[in-house]
């Protein structure tokens, strides 16, 4: 029998990203010649998540968006790591003092300070903060952790395939069902789109999207009034409150009593699922994405939302 030399999708992804990475100034040389552990600073949440997943403890991280100073799920690994400010405004002085070998940044957040970062250290500059597979693969290549990254991507694809099959069984005859991801804020609702972090995971699982979500651009839609609720009407809702405040909870309490809400399919069918805002909206990495799968698995195993 001739051995199958076809690259697994995760291997192809990692190889393509790794080759692109080696073309970046300084990165390929640092990764290939350095044998001791890199001193790495991560300037966005998904990079911190990915470093932990790869078994690397950064020498510096930025503050989390909530559950400050660091998300609870990352605290066991990062509790003792120094902080270098906010994701949107990292402290260059603190970064210099930590003497990093590699800074992982995002063009979306850090384009303006990129020339200054490059004077401090080699910089791995990713485009977005929520493309978790690309972040994982590129960081794995930059830190000589290609094998670990490949294994994590393979585990992810196997888990997605299994969960997709469970969802197809649960919603037999109706699959793919439509989905909306709703963030209940103090004075409005955000509906996350296929291009968002959560949206990319749901699309990979095979969920369908509402017409409004398919036609929209960007990562979210803002619904300023309850009268806009029919726009997000879907078979299943995943909802969370990114702002953990009394005002956001009050808005949610009013929302579920509104006649328009009660006429939507998901509430009528008891398919409204409360999920973790950090995992679904703020984590941006492979560990956070797997926490999403944990919660979606509950949907596949249950008859209705509690």
Task: Go through each PLM region and give its residues.
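Basic- and aromatic-lined ligand-binding clefts that recognize polyanionic substrates
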Residues: 39-54, 151-212
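N-terminal secretory signal peptides
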Residues: 1-13, 20-24, 31-32
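Proline-aspartate-enriched helix->loop->beta-strand connector
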Residues: 99-103, 234
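Ligand-binding pocket segment of bilobal, Venus flytrap-like solute-binding proteins
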Residues: 217-246
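Extracytoplasmic substrate-binding proteins
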Residues: 113-187, 271, 279-306
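A short, structured surface patch at a secondary-structure boundary
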Residues: 39, 47-97
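C-terminal segment of N-terminal export signals and the immediately downstream linker at the start
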Residues: 26-42, 46
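Structured C-terminal subdomain patch of bacterial secreted/periplasmic proteins
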Residues: 38, 239-306
């Amino acid at each position: 029998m001739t051995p199958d030399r076809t690259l697994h999708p995760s291997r192809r992804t990692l190889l393509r990203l790794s080759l692109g990475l080696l073309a970046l100034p300084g990165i390929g040389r640092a990764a290939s010649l350095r044998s001791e552990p890199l001193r790495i600073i991560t300037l966005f949440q998904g990079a911190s998540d990915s470093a932990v997943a790869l078994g690397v403890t950064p020498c510096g991280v930025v503050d989390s968006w909530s559950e400050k100073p660091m998300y609870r799920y990352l605290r066991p690994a990062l509790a003792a790591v120094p902080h270098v400010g906010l994701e949107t405004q990292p402290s260059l002085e603190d970064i210099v003092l930590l003497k990093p070998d590699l800074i992982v940044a995002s063009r979306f957040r850090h384009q303006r300070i990129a020339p200054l970062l490059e004077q401090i250290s080699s910089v791995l500059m990713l485009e977005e903060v929520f493309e978790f597979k690309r972040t994982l693969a590129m960081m794995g290549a930059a830190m000589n952790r290609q094998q670990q990254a490949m294994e994590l991507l393979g585990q992810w694809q196997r888990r997605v395939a299994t969960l997709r099959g469970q969802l197809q069984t649960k919603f037999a005859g109706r699959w793919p069902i439509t989905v909306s991801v709703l963030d209940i804020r103090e004075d409005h609702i955000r509906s996350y789109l296929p291009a968002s972090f959560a949206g990319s995971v749901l699309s990979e699982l095979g969920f369908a999207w509402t017409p409004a979500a398919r036609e929209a651009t960007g990562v979210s839609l803002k619904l300023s009034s309850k009268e806009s609720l029919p726009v997000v009407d879907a078979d299943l809702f995943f909802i969370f409150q990114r702002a953990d405040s009394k005002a956001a909870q009050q808005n949610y309490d009013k929302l579920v009593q509104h006649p328009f809400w009660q006429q939507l399919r998901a509430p009528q069918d008891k398919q409204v699922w409360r999920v973790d805002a950090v995992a679904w909206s703020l984590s941006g990495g492979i560990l956070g994405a797997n926490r999403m799968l944990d919660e979606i698995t509950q949907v596949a195993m249950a008859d209705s939302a509690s």
